[in-house]
Design a protein with these regions (language model features):
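Extended helical coiled-coil dimerization/tether regions that scaffold
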Residues: 64, 143-264
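Short coil/turn segments at secondary-structure boundaries
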Residues: 130-131, 206, 353-357
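P-loop NTPase switch/coupling surface
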Residues: 1-157, 194, 198, 385-402
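Non-catalytic, well-ordered alpha-helical scaffold segments
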Residues: 8, 112-115, 142, 237-240, ...
Length: 402
């Protein structure tokens, strides 16, 4: 959808709906509907417009649980001063309450879904002041802390890396094995780095001395390099920190999976503008990479990039226009970017002044004014140089004159 079509609002609504289950968990917080979300309606009274927010604001959701049980729930904000209701979310809350009881009993068969929302401000963010180590209270629901804040909370993640790295060194001193959950998270990050850089020998570790994540790799000259992740470009940082945040949350939520935690944990991840900071070559593969690194996760993303849209099938695409969800009008997978721009995003791939000359050419052809058509086409050829569409227009003009 275009700017203002409602992509971010849709993702935030899904986040509010999903976070409802957190009301049943110790230490996790549900999101609420903001009064600013109310639709504004203007009434003409006298010489002025009287603008009034429209209530109630309601979010309705339907989900499939464990591939078989379908549930439905609603959250509502009835007035500007009211609170977001949970009374119509009984089905979801019963499931969450059952999860909480199983957590209290130490049930290792319980698989907690990873749930997170990443907004456009997700770049390697140190926005929260977390001076105390929340992992002192070692509970699996720590994996939900700040998961709906819209950013990868680097302070929380670094606390976890420090704790697990210390445990790794203690294991080594005592003759024990590695920490499989930590290695699984590093492996996910290494896969991500290798895929977007073309490297095949990257190694990611937590540096206790600098309290940074370091990445080691072999450069173009065969020299082994080691630099802090924080010194990489925005594109690398945003993508790798996203993968790291998802992976470490999985490890906290489901430590019983050990080294297979990223492969076995399911869940839903929301990403606003998944193409943010990414080179077009990365945009083409970002969804494929994410779904291969986390094969049991459902990703719901928004994008303006045709390179992202043509990397997925038509049935996986929703087009938003005027707050309405529409199916893609054509197959998207493998289509060229210009075709996606025209048919899906309703964007002209050429500047308006150039498009006007194209229109003038075809208008001249319709009027059989071939001299005018030739003049317009020659001007376009001078401006654009070698262009397949211009070559086709030249052939058409020659055929018309036979």
């Amino acid at each position: 959808g275009a700017k203002g079509a409602g992509k971010t609002s849709l993702l935030e609504s899904i986040a509010i709906a999903m976070s409802t289950m957190f009301t049943a968990f110790d230490g996790a917080k549900a999101m609420n509907i903001n009064k600013e979300s109310a639709h504004l309606k203007a009434y003409r009274i006298g010489s002025t417009d009287n603008v009034q927010p429209q209530y109630p604001v309601r979010i309705s959701a339907r989900a499939e649980i464990d591939g078989k049980q379908e549930i439905y729930w609603e959250r509502t904000l009835n007035t500007a001063k009211g609170k977001t209701t949970i009374k119509d979310a009984r089905q979801l809350l019963e499931i969450a309450e059952n999860y909480q009881k199983r957590l209290q009993k130490g049930d290792t068969t319980l698989v907690l879904p990873v749930i997170a929302y990443y907004g456009t401000g997700r770049l390697w963010d140190y926005h929260r002041e977390k001076q105390t180590d929340i992992f002192e209270k070692n509970t699996r629901t720590n994996g939900y802390i700040d998961c709906m804040s819209g950013t990868a909370n680097i302070k929380l993640m670094m606390n976890w890396f420090l704790k697990m790295t210390v445990q790794k060194y203690q294991n080594q001193e005592n003759g024990y094995g590695p920490v499989p959950e930590l290695e699984a998270v590093f492996s996910a990050m290494e896969q991500c780095y290798n895929r977007i850089t073309g490297s095949n020998d990257s190694k990611i570790q937590y540096n206790i001395g600098t309290k940074e994540i370091d990445v080691a790799y072999t450069d173009l000259y065969g020299v082994r390099m080691r630099i802090p992740l924080n010194q990489l470009s925005d594109g690398y940082k945003s993508t790798i920190s996203l993968v790291a945040d998802i992976a470490y949350r999985m490890a906290v939520l489901n430590p019983q999976f050990l080294g297979e935690v990223c492969l076995k944990t399911d869940g839903i991840i929301l990403i606003d503008e998944v193409d943010l900071h990414l080179h077009p070559a990365w945009q083409k593969r970002i969804l494929k990479d994410l779904t291969e690194i986390f094969p049991n996760v459902q990703f719901v993303v928004s994008t303006h990039a045709p390179e992202v849209i043509n990397s997925v099938l038509r049935e996986q695409v929703i087009v938003l226009e005027n707050y309405q969800a529409l199916p893609a009008p054509m197959e998207t997978y493998g289509k060229d970017a210009n075709g996606i721009l025209r048919a899906i995003m309703r964007v002209k791939e050429r500047p308006n002044d150039i498009m006007e000359q194209f229109d003038a050419f075809y208008h001249a052809i319709d009027l059989h004014d071939y001299m005018q058509a030739d003049e317009i086409l020659s001007n376009l050829e001078e401006l654009l140089g070698d262009d397949p569409e211009l070559a086709a227009m030249r052939v058409q003009l020659e055929l018309e004159q036979i």
